[in-house]
Amino acid sequence: MDARFLGLESMFTTLGINSAKTFQMWYNSGLKGRETQGLNIAGCQYAPAQADFTAEFLESTGVIKTMATIVDLNSEPLARGKEVEIKKHEFQIPRQKVKVNFGENDMRKQIIELNKADANARLGGNSPYATVRDFIANRLYDSLAEIPDQHVQRLNFLRGQMFGKHEVTLDADNNQSGIALTLKSAVPDGNIVTEQWYTTASDGAVTYVESADPILTIKKKTRALRNDHYHGYRNITVEMNASTFFTVVEHPKVLQKLGYLVRPEFELVTSNDSKAQTLGKQKLLSMSDELLKEWFKEAIGADELLIDSTIVGAARLDSSSKKFVTDAIDAFPVGVVLVRPSGIVSDIFNVTPYRPDAQDIYTNIFEGRGIIEYFYNARQREQTWISEFTALPVLTRPGDMYYYNVAGKTATYTPVVSPSGNPKAQGYYEKSSTGEYVLTEDTDVQSGKTYYTKS
């Protein structure tokens, strides 16, 4: 069989996709479901589609109700209005695209495979037509499935970064061959706190800051928000990356509280703290993840605890191998704890795509918020599908988002080779008798003494 006689030079022709209507029907029946597979847009809702690329929204603060004025029998109170602080925020909405090509070499490989399928079918006494058609349908599905999958991954990244870092930075690491920019939210600087609970070394080893108390810190914040009727709120969600969560629950102060839960009498004597930590670690190992999350949620006073484990892939061209490699990126960054109102706190602003005329072959995606267009270059014998989806999750309650940057890098101390000058002025360290590194007080280099630089 010559596969060309069945019109297999075009996957669309074989499957009868020759108009926008038939393309839409095929997409809805096969690929539409992938638009929500693995999608994490918790706390978001789609805003109405718009024509321009500028997102605008208004943010208002709470209003404290004032008391009535007490006057004498014949006096009138002063008329007064109500002042509500309203802020206007603007953002630019970036466009994302995916391109899938199917060229002559791909077609030739396909025809070779189809001829093999035809021969096998004939040997078995079967009709080759169903085999060929199924092959084409699967090949098209696998090729175009990349489009909704990649848009889902990008949306996950935008949501995770905006919620976890209160901004999105696009660079060569996560958007190679695309634009480089930073999209900032309107979260006030005062809502962002750096309070290290642990540090991580280059080899992944974790060192806990024992003076920190993660549960107490978050508990005080959730309690303060519930009691603040002006800037606070009642229903509270705490969100963090899964890696952050499982690191935090092994903090000595957290293990201590878990141990006291098992043996409440330990709390009567301070010297029992270490025993409680040991007991807490044993309890931690025996608890299921779901039970642990529920206990932690209750301990910090949250109504909802979201543990984000979404991983997205970033493709980049390796300069040495000249091949594309995929790097894994945490959508919600590690080392951040977010305290926010439960429910919707973000609108996904989206721009209506400019649709071609009725002669073009295209399909709507993501409920009409994006499109996939089909092009065929007869001269180059190349089929191309290009998608367009313009969307950005924007924090619409930025003043209610509170961030704790809780992870740091473990310091490394490197010996100074042939030190000279003033060690103290140069910020050198020395090792104390207890093994700790402390800033030196030496103003002259002491013979036989080792000095260190901190990094």
Predicted regions and their residues:
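Long, contiguous amphipathic alpha-helices that act as assembly "spine/axial" helices in icosahedral shell
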Residues: F91-N191, E210-F245, R381-E388
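Helix N-terminus capping/helix-initiation residues
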Residues: N74, N101-G103, N241, S288, ...
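N-terminal alpha-helical "arm" segments
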Residues: M1-E56, Y402-Y403, A411-Y413, S455
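Assembly/oligomerization interface modules of large self-assembling protein complexes
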Residues: N40-L123, I179-T182
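Sequence/fold signature of self-assembling virion shell proteins
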Residues: L255-L439, T443-T450, K454-S455
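Extended, solvent-exposed, turn-rich assembly/linker loops in the middle of proteins
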Residues: Q176-W295
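A structural detector for beta-sheet-dominated domains
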Residues: K87, P94, N101, N115, ...
